[in-house]
Amino acid sequence: HMVRAGEHYASVKWLQQGFINAYGSQEKGATARNMFGQKDGTVNPRSEEDFAAQVWIDKGPQWANGGTAMVVRRIRMNVDTWEKLDRSSRENAIGRKLDTGAPLTGEDEFDAVDFDAVDDYGLPVIDKNSHMAVAAPPADHPEQRILRRPYNYELAPDGKDGQLSNIGQVFICYQQDPTQQFEPIQARLDESDLMNEWLTHIGSAMYFCPPGTLAADGRESWWAKSLCEHAGL
């Protein structure tokens, strides 16, 4: 719809088709799953207060206020080797249970995580290099949180790397400031995330999303009004 509505003003630069669960196949607000079968997006802002603190820009130039920064990454997922793992190995890599999405120290998807829990042998229940543990914000940097909106993709095998599948994710996240939120998270993941064994980042971009229209106060009577006026358009 947006492409058709803007055909006289803009052209498509790049397109990646993606999909998530069909509408009505899950309860409203349920966390979607990625192509590894994992719930993806459990730790997302939920309340208006969370969105105000993590997503909507409230500092900087006036034209950016109320908007958000969007990071897009194409991530190829090696499903061929992932499917050779047993269930416990998959859950250890992510730090969560496959069926419920609960942390390995809990029973429900949204249970609090206990990173200090150990098993009968004194080993951590949640591996310190699991995806969940590495992505979690440090105690001294609670601002390192983002809104995830990933989409799955499945294309015909291209034969370039010998995989039987060409499957992955269009990872999209929103935040106030990528340099203070997304980038430090991704730096930790690059360094030690166990999931790196099965993930290859093949594309990356960053965008600014203007705020929606706010006809009531006249500031944004049409989309991107403040941005266009600032740019002299």
Indicate where each model-derived feature is located.
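Long, histidine/aromatic-enriched segments associated with O2/redox biology
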Residues: 1-233
